[in-house]
Amino acid sequence: MPARNTALRYGYVAQSLHWVIVGLLIVQVTLGTIADDLPLGFEKLVTLARHKSFGITILGLAVIRLAWRWTNPPPPLPPMPRWQHLAANLNHWALYALLFAMPLSGWMMSSASNIPVSWFGFVQLPDLVGPDRAWKGRFLELHHFLAWCLYALAGLHVVAAIKHQFIDRDGLLMRMIPGRPR
């Protein structure tokens, strides 16, 4: 399989970035949910530190994914009604925006809480904002709101892919599945 996208399918670079980010998002939801349920203490702090590290990883991968997309356009969508084409493009760009906004809102929340953010303990990241309890609360609310937006848009993305695979039978889903073209 080629590294670059072709007219018929995504190359292995785009596919790898897509599926690694999907896997990390599942890890993030799990860690975030676990952290919310833990009492304040060592275990919660370790879980949140991992959540932040994976969030920064997703942010870095999103930068790479977007740069790859700009230099390596995706294959064209199969024929479909104009509104579906528009909805697909809006959904993709909204998902990209969330891949940036989610980690940044979490990073700003930590900064406003005066809690340092590091990447797996190797690199300490600078604060994005100064300590401020009110802003910490606002960034927390924003982070949770964006999470619900991500769930909704990712769910729509999955449902649309399944629709194209099993109802439209247009091969759209197979463009992002690793392996031989089908």
PLM regions with names:
Residues 1-182:
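Membrane-embedded alpha-helical bundles that constitute the cytochrome b-like, heme-associated redox core
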